[in-house]
Amino acid sequence: MAKDLRIVTVSLWEIIKIHSLTFVFGVWIMCKMSAKWVWDPKSFFTLQQRDTPPACLVDSSLGQHKYVKLKGVKFHYVECGSRDLPLVLLLHGFPDCWLSWRHQIPVLSQHFRVVALDLKGFGDSDKPSSRKTYRIDMILEELQQLIISLGVSSCTVVGHDIGGLLGWCLAHQFPELVDKLVAVSCPHPNVYRTSLHTSSNYRWLNFVQLPYFPEVDALREDVKIISKYHKHLPPHDTYLEAYKYAFCRKEDWTGPLNYFRNLLFIEVAENSRTIQVPVVLITGDRDKFIKLESIVKSTDYCEKFQVKIVDGARHFPHQERHQQFNEILLKSLVKKKSVEDGGLERSASKGIVNRMFGAVSSTVKYGNSVLDTVHKKTNGVVGSIPTINLLSYANIYDRTDS
């Protein structure tokens, strides 16, 4: 599918399984939609008209709003920081836009040139409706062209959710473009796909494979799905209204949903080389969409990695606990002298280590499999779970040595 077959299409059996589940869950969710419509049609079709963008979407205090046209597609992005500094490319998730990084742009721009992109189909970027225009090979080539158009040969990529999946794929397909990868609330694509059956939104992911109906469902009850995903924002919050403005039309949903309609059908080739550049995986300890086990398994695809847990955060740690998140991000991205002990940069916060251990040991459902993964990664160094040393455990989650 893509250059050198690093990103490939899943097996025929997987494709058949996805389409079969699409039919089953599609019928089920459409029946639920019909029941809600019959029960309360007025509420179901409520959609507030939003003609004027909230000030925060067009405010230039976070940076300059710019546009670039690549392969016939217009991309919108916000840029901040000196052009002489290393580039950090921020890729938002779903349902979101460049504004997702409002707490990170001011902090990062003190050390980096920051570009917060509206992905194709989102925000003020073009929104082609065709599903094929969101094929992963096309998306990656456009990101490659974007980085080149910014006048650099490589950059640090920070991606959340869908943006994280694209970051993983970009690091595999065009490793020369990525200096460092930060994946926020996002496991490796192969782990993401194989762990979907344990995800709380598994039915929805299969439902969105259908045409038209998922877009209609997203608009019901005044774009209720936005409030569902952004629970950390209070009702009538300025930023919540900004998101509702950005997703208040049917065509505002087709592009974003097309990512899911394509990403479920791809994987990184098993013979693909592990990612050589440093990878930082950041997740909230209360994320119901992403399991800690999937984050740990994702390190199998990395040569150098760090795993960081944001205490008290769900799926949007960079917004919900932005101060703690920014501290982790800066510590990971801004170069500092490593400790003398083998060049390994240990976590500065013992509290984070304890929370990580607590998250694993207290989660009975998948704790054993996580610890098994840890055991494999240490080649038997951690031999007995009851006597595991917290500092050794921290080192496993911060493998930054060569």
Task: Give short role names for the model-derived ranges.
Residues 103-112, 149:
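A short, Lys/Arg-enriched amphipathic alpha-helix followed by its capping loop at the start of a domain
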Residues 99-102, 168-172, 326:
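Short, hydrophobic alpha-helix immediately C-terminal to the catalytic nucleophile
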Residues 100, 119-122:
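Recognition helices and adjacent regulatory flanks at domain boundaries
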Residues 106, 117-120:
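N-terminal cap/lid subdomain of alpha/beta-hydrolase-fold enzymes
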